[in-house]
Amino acid sequence: MANASICTIGDEILIGQIVDTNSSHISQALEEIGVKVTRMTSFGDDHDEIVCNLTNELTHNEIVITTGGLGPTKDDITKAALAEISGSKGYVVNESQLKMVHEILHARGLDVLDINKAQALVPDTCEVIVNHLGTAPIMVFRFPKERY
C-alpha cells in the first residue's frame, strides 16, 4: 500500500477565510484505491515554507498531493516552489490548458487577461492534466525514489 500526504497551500486557509474540504474528498478517493493517507497539513503562501514542507513530505511518502496556491494572483507562488523542487529549467505554455482558460472565462462572459493566461504556464518538469473545472492546470511531477 502506497503512502500519501495531502498538503493544502494558501494564507486564506490558515486564517480561516476558506475551509479545506478538498482534503477529505481526496483522502476518501485515495482510500478507495488502496492508498493510505499518513498526513494532512496546511501552510501559507511563502516560497521557502512551501519548498521545505513539500521536500519533507516527499521524503516520507510516495505520493504528495497539493491543493490551493495556484490562483491567478501575484501572491500564489506554489508553481515557482514546485519548479524549484523539481529542478525545472523554465516554464512552457500548455496549449490545452490555455484553450481551457479561454473557454471557461468566455463562458462566464469574462475577458482573458495576462494573469489568466499565466495559469497555462507550467514548469518544464511536469505533465499536465487539463482541468475542465477551473483555470489552474493539474500538474503531475514524478521524482526518482532515490532523490528523497
Model feature map: region roles:
Residues 61:
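An anion/phosphate-binding loop that grips the pyrophosphate of nucleotide cofactors and donors
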Residues 11-12, 69-72:
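Short glycine-rich anion-binding loops that position phosphate/pyrophosphate groups of nucleotides
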Residues 49, 77-148:
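Proline/glycine-rich low-complexity loops and linkers
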Residues 1-41:
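Glycine-rich phosphate/diphosphate-binding loop of Rossmann-like nucleotide-binding domains
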Residues 39-49:
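Short beta->alpha junction loops
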Residues 25, 49-53:
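Well-ordered alpha-helical segments embedded in enzymatic catalytic cores
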